[in-house]
Regions:
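A short, glycine- and basic residue-enriched loop/turn
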Residues: 53, 58, 102, 107, ...
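Short secondary-structure junctions
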Residues: 1-3, 116-118
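Conserved glycine-rich acetyl-CoA-binding loop
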Residues: 64-81, 88-90, 94-95, 100-108, ...
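C-terminal "cap" of GNAT-fold acetyltransferases
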Residues: 93, 100-103, 123-141
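Acetyl-CoA-dependent GNAT
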Residues: 2-69, 80-82, 86, 90, ...
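Structured loop/turn residues at beta-strand edges in well-structured enzyme cores
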Residues: 45, 90, 116, 130-132
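Non-catalytic, surface-exposed connector residues within folded enzymatic/regulatory domains
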Residues: 22, 73, 128-131
């Protein structure tokens, strides 16, 4: 189990300025300490992270974020590869995620990685009093 203390929460908040808006400390602590939840940091450290949960057959990427200054350097691809390696090692059959329909850059990355669109979640995200749909994407191992 990952020890969640103030320094971990602060580290994530430094990478992602909106982290504390999206995750309260108590919710994050509870979630990250679940048995089937993982958090990977980027290399080099403190440039990005990926959080996922998993079952015996599926991984759900809950959050992936790369600091704006370090985007388009392959960090997100490296994090996705780490999740894929985890899936292969644990004989997990697929990886799923949701992405805002407005996040074209992320959708291009996911499609290049091999994800396909499998559905839409209406009004999934809230951004400045506006509801935004999410595309559900899946990658088969």
């Amino acid at each position: 189990m990952l020890k969640v203390d103030n320094s971990l929460y602060c580290a994530l908040s430094k990478i992602d300025p909106d982290f504390s808006k999206d995750w309260s400390k108590s919710f994050f602590t509870t979630f990250i300490n679940l048995k089937n939840t993982r958090l990977y940091f980027s290399e080099p450290a403190n440039k990005g992270y990926i959080i996922f949960s998993y079952t015996s057959f599926e991984i759900e990427i809950v959050s992936i974020f790369i600091n704006l200054k370090y985007r388009r350097l392959g960090i997100a691809s490296t994090l996705l590869e780490k999740v894929k390696e985890f899936a292969i090692k644990n004989k997990i059959l697929r990886i799923v995620l949701e992405v805002s329909v407005e996040n074209n850059i992320a959708m291009v990355l996911y499609k290049r990685f091999g994800f396909i669109e499998v559905g839409i979640r209406q009004n999934y995200y809230k951004k400045k009093n506006k509801l935004i749909d999410a595309k559900v994407m899946s990658y088969s191992i």
